[in-house]
Amino acid sequence: MNRTLFAPVIAVLGLLLQPSAWALDEAGSQRLLSIQQRWAEVQYDTPEKQKPAEFEKLALQAQAFTQEQPTAAEAWIWNGIVVSSWAGAEGGLGALGKAKQSKASLEKALQLDPAALQGSAYTSLAALYDRVPGWPIGFGDADKADALLRSALQLNPNGIDSLYFWGDHLYRQGHYVEAKAALLKAKLAAPRPGRELADEGRRGEIDALLKDVEHKLD
């Protein structure tokens, strides 16, 4: 499996979510934030060659979190994100298998609480459907991504992630005017306390995609 098929998943998934987690106690919320912040460190401050090993370590922590908090959708969301990031960093034949594991974790989160972390499971799962190859190689499906993103926007209409992924989806579908509007709105989203590095990375992605959109509109 070509690593480039999954590389975008690293960036797009791990930037999701605010640190608030109403279904978790204080210790669980701190554990969640620790995983989120470590993800950002690996993603943005770690050399490429070291990322697979570091994501593998973080995946073990995320899996342990789901075992400790099996009814917390937040734990399953981040397990899915970390495993997907590991797949993107490692590449190779195992990438699709890890993407499927990520999908299963996100679906579990939706079963437990679709509204957890402002519906971020919808957004994360949509990102997978938009980026993983379609049949017969993988499970990618633009129509499913569209439906999931609409659900995410109902729960979080002004979030930087839901708007970014919606703009990205519209761009992929050739709806450049609508994509630009969504991305410009995403730039106005409020910052997320504790997720400064993630927000910085997301805004960089927004700016980069806006350049691509403008090129298509020229």
Regions found by a protein language model. Name each.
Residues 70, 114-116, 157:
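Short coil turns that delineate tetratricopeptide repeat
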Residues 182, 188-218:
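Terminal, low-structured helical/coil segments at or just beyond the last alpha-helical repeat
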Residues 48-63, 95-104, 138-146, 182-183:
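Helix-turn-helix repeat elements of alpha-solenoid scaffolds
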Residues 75, 119-121, 162, 196:
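TPR alpha-solenoid repeat register
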Residues 21-61:
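N-terminal leader/linker segments that initiate helical-solenoid repeat arrays
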